[in-house]
Amino acid sequence: MKEKVTAMKSGMYIVKAEEDQIEKIVDMSIRAFETDVNVGGTKGDCPPEFDSIEWHKQMAREGHLYQAMIEKDLVGAAIVFPDETQRSLYIGRIFIDSVYHRKGYGIRLMECIESNFPCSTEFNLDTPCWNERTNAFYQRLGYRIIKIEDGFNFYQKRRVIGRH
């Protein structure tokens, strides 16, 4: 049985992605990232491999792809890369299926990720400078810009072990 990690009071939990869910996860990725045109993106300006089944399968095999669940419903996913010490985590990508947007699920997913890596004291991620939605989202969650480079804002959030 797969271990699940639940965010407090949210009902959402994450588990390592299951092989039979990859195609559904990729469909969600496509729908989620295609909504970026609504917040300043140009059509087709999506993350690398966002629509690749093979790449998502590889991420799952390597243990980086997590599926976000509410009860038995798959609502989104995350791709994360802990360092060898588990003290630092790079959040490569998160997405919530566009049919579930504007329900707080992105916040819940980030809470699940942070809860799933209790030894991590540093969380890092990046997002395009033009994307007002994601920049406001990460700042609202306590992430701070540490660098701007090549059209991307690089964010970091630190925490003291034992506090979330």
Regions found by a protein language model. Give the residues of each.
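Conserved acetyl-CoA pyrophosphate-binding loop and the N-cap/start of the following alpha-helix
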Residues: Y100, G104-C112
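A short helix-loop-beta-strand connector motif used in the catalytic cores of GNAT acetyltransferases and
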Residues: I53-Q67
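A short, internal acetyl-CoA/4′-phosphopantetheine-binding micro-motif in the GNAT/acyltransferase core
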Residues: I94-H101, T127-P128
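Conserved GNAT acetyl-CoA-binding A-motif
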Residues: M110, N116-C129
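Conserved active-site alpha-helix within GNAT-family acetyltransferase domains
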Residues: I107-R108, C129-K147
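Conserved beta-strand in the GNAT
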Residues: Q67, D73-P82, S88-Y90, F95
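Conserved GNAT-fold acetyl-CoA-binding loop/helix
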Residues: I30-W55
